[in-house]
């Protein structure tokens, strides 16, 4: 897809500050995705251990425990936002912002992950019951903190 974006491009050079911005978008996405997945991994290994200096805050029903702070306190699927930002950062760096073809890559993640989040929430509601409802009040945003 990236090679298709180079066909018939104007020969303008992207300014350095824009390349830095594009790289920041990618690395913010990488930090969200990798950081959230690592926090979940370490929490499952030892629920009392801190991660990046953050003491885990949880809710429990006695049998099950859900993490409600750190990355997972920002939104219920913050790692999905990270994946979308990484794809966007890659396209901005290697594609041309005005070409359509490269944008299919981040659009693929949006089309894949937004419906998947709805399915994940349904599965979690069935699995955790009342605990999930309590979790929804603690972490109201689905993917994008403060927006959705």
Report the location of each language-model feature.
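Hydrophobic transmembrane alpha-helices
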Residues: 1-148
């Amino acid at each position: 897809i990236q090679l298709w974006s180079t066909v018939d491009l104007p020969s303008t050079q992207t300014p350095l500050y824009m390349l830095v911005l594009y790289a920041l978008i990618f690395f913010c996405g990488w930090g969200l995705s990798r950081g959230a997945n690592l926090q979940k991994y370490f929490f499952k290994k030892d629920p009392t251990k801190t991660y990046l200096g953050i003491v885990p805050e949880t809710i429990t029903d006695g049998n099950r425990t859900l993490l409600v702070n750190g990355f997972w306190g920002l939104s219920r699927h913050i790692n999905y936002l990270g994946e979308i930002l990484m794809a966007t950062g890659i396209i901005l760096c290697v594609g041309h912002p005005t070409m359509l073809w490269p944008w299919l890559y981040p659009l693929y993640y949006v089309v894949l992950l937004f419906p998947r989040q709805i399915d994940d929430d349904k599965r979690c509601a069935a699995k955790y019951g009342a605990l999930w409802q309590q979790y929804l009040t603690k972490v109201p945003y689905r993917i994008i903190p403060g927006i959705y």
